[in-house]
Amino acid sequence: MTDLSRRDLLAGAAGFLGGAALAGLPLAADGQGAAAPAAAGAAPAPPPPRPVAPLDATKMPGAPTAALGARSEYFAPTRIPNGTPVGSSRTPLQDLTGTITPSDLHFERHHAGIPTLDPERHTLTIHGLVDRPMSFTVDDIKRFPQITRTYFIECSGNGGAGYRDPKPDTTPQPLAGLFSTSEWTGVPLATLFREVGVKPDATWFLAEGGDACKLARSIPIAKAWDDAMIVWAQNGEPLRPAQGYPMRLLLPGFEGNSNVKWLRRLELGTKPWMTRWETSKYTDPLPDGTARIFTFEIDAKSVITSPCYPNTIPSHGWRSVNGLAWSGRGRITRVEVSVDGGTTWHDAELLNTPQPKSTVRFQYM
């Protein structure tokens, strides 16, 4: 396991540095916030009506209990969906605290919409270079010893828009919102591989999803023996359909597209399958016209979530700089923040214990 320090973090986080985030924020002479102007070329959305609260809540009974809890009417974070079956929705990072993303705000990325799968009929088949090909239902997998871990998942395209066309009126949501962190519960993939008996010459496995596009990725088998999981629960409840219900592959630190949702098949072999998802789709174009394939690990990144557009910075008093840092190559052990465009750097405080391939919340005062 590799620990990552300041230089490693900054190498992968240049587009999200503190100086860049603060430079475009206006100073408020009276210390009051300003309303957010509309994005360029878009009509301003009317503000939602403000909920009406009693003048004195101690003078009247409150709301009754309910079957499901709900957020306060005064706090209504939303994702940014594109509204098509082949699309995505982005997490409102600027509205959240801590490191865990609420399940209903976890980012989405789909290639053929969200399938409806019956957990009693859906199975995971493991075959190929194994001694005992087997199929498992979700209940079958739940019989094995389970583990719970906290990991982030990030789409490989996260941050692309911000790097290509940076704008001063960009919030963390469109800039870095294809990134979320959750507590995941499942079984180590190594446990299932031992159950089926992996043959010695198996060096790769193919993971295939059960959605309409049957997304499939080739993965080095070393990842299965390391920390890969088959998960069925997220943040204390079964996976939501958009996150792969009833089961998905979780590859900590690997690009989001390799964490195959609605997992239905694992095939073991001696070489990559060269599917269209790893040849024409998820590749890295190079200047010489060729493309790099099979890049898996997410490099160190960070994003400042507060202050951000459309916040204003008071002309007096304290204001903390708050954000998130993460890496798929180890744990974040140090974060530094610049408020002068990179001329000087200052240590930020880490607000939670760094964990491998997970997220750290930091602040600088």
Label the model's feature ranges.
Residues G41-M365:
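Structured, non-membrane catalytic/scaffold regions adjacent to prosthetic-group chemistry
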Residues F16, G33, P37, P46-V52:
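Intrinsically disordered, low-structural-confidence terminal and linker regions
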Residues L22-G24, E195:
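Residues at alpha-helix termini
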Residues G15, L27-D30, G98-T101:
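Intrinsic disorder/low-complexity segments in short proteins, especially the signal peptide
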Residues A14, A20-A21, G31, S72:
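Prokaryotic Sec-type signal peptides and long signal-anchor helices
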Residues M1-A20:
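N-terminal secretory signal peptides and thylakoid transit peptides that target proteins
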Residues G24-A42:
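Signal peptide processing junction and immediate N-terminal pro/mature segment
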